[in-house]
Amino acid sequence: MRHIIFAALSAFLVIASIVQAGHHEETEKPPVIGMGLSAGGESKPLYAGALSNMKIWEEYIQAHNDRDFEKIASMNAEDFSVVMADGQRVVGSKAQRETLEGWIRESNTTWEIQWIIPNNAENDDGEMEEWLATGQMLTMTDSEGNTSMEYHLVDVKLDEGKIALGYVASMENLTAQ
């Protein structure tokens, strides 16, 4: 009888441990990699994001270099907008296309990704948002063959795998190497 009770108790403990381990893994948050201020000014942790989100940005930038404006538009969220380094707000894929076409016509811009950091942050409503912090070197060649470079930092908000929002900061007039 003692063996039956011991076996039953052992089985119960093993099952309880498995259930607890499975439950623990489901609720575990990814590592904290930094902090950020929410729109409401509250300091919130930044969590490591999904590495698979890097592919979205790589494809998006490749579409820029390929001048594939249809692909760019298809990768944008319905409510897409970007705030440029000069404060100009570009709202919608149509406005983005017009901006890009003019920029490319003037300077034959190409983009080279330097780095991408996927991260997640909780917004003021308690919902997790997916972001990419990115750095790109842009090379521009004007109609006279003069080359200049700009380094762009772009914070990108993703919404269901699409580009929803971007904030651009830049260092301009870098000497081409």
PLM segments and residue spans:
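A short hydrophobic beta-strand element
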Residues: 127-138
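A solvent-exposed, acidic/Ser-Thr-rich amphipathic alpha-helical stretch
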Residues: 70-121, 128-130
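Short, cysteine-centered beta-strand-loop-beta hairpins and adjacent loop/turn segments enriched
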Residues: 139-149
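Short beta-strand edge/turn micro-motifs at domain boundaries
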Residues: 149-177
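Extracellular/periplasmic catalytic domains that process cell-envelope and extracellular macromolecules
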Residues: 125-128, 147
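Bacterial Sec-dependent N-terminal signal peptides
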Residues: 1-28, 33-34
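Short, low-complexity N-terminal intrinsically disordered segments enriched in polar/charged residues
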Residues: 22-66, 70, 74
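A mature extracytoplasmic/lumenal domain signature
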Residues: 76, 86, 136-138, 154, ...
